[in-house]
Swiss-Prot record:
Protein origin, superkingdom: Eukaryota
InterPro entries found in the cross-reference section: FXYD4, FXYD_motif, Ion-transport_regulator_FXYD
Signal peptide, first to last residue: 1-20
Gene name, Swiss-Prot/TrEMBL: Fxyd4
Membrane topology: Single-pass type I membrane protein
Tissue-level expression: Selectively present in the distal parts of the nephron (medullary and papillary collecting ducts and end portions of cortical collecting tubule) and in the epithelial cells of the distal colon. No expression is found in renal proximal tubule, loop of henle and distal tubule, proximal colon, small intestine, lung, choroid plexus, salivary glands, or brain.
Cellular compartments annotated: Cell membrane; Basolateral cell membrane
Name of the protein: FXYD domain-containing ion transport regulator 4
Location of region: Disordered: 67-87
Length: 87
């Protein structure tokens, strides 16, 4: 029964391929100009990269290195002591 269901779902998934138009149908709402889309993505990515490098080198986002270390207690009490854990 499981094999029949799987085969039926595969046939249903493949049915739209039979009615699909070729990729040259420029009037289709699902036609994309992939070259322009890729070029726009590369330009956008390059601008983001340049902006990130400029922000990192500008010194506006400084990590403050002169923090005073937090005072920790000298002796830390363990949460689980030997023999306190039950199995």
């Amino acid at each position: 029964m499981e094999g029949i269901t799987c085969a039926f779902l595969l046939v249903l998934a493949g049915l739209p391929v039979l009615e699909a138009n070729g990729p040259v149908d420029k009037g289709s709402p699902f036609y994309y100009d992939w070259e322009s889309l890729q070029l726009g993505g590369m330009i956008f990515g390059g601008l983001l990269c340049i902006a990130g490098i400029a922000m990192a080198l500008s010194g506006k986002c400084k990590c403050r290195r002169n923090h005073t270390p937090s005072s920790l207690p000298e002796k830390v009490t363990p949460l689980i002591t030997p023999g306190s854990a039950s199995t």
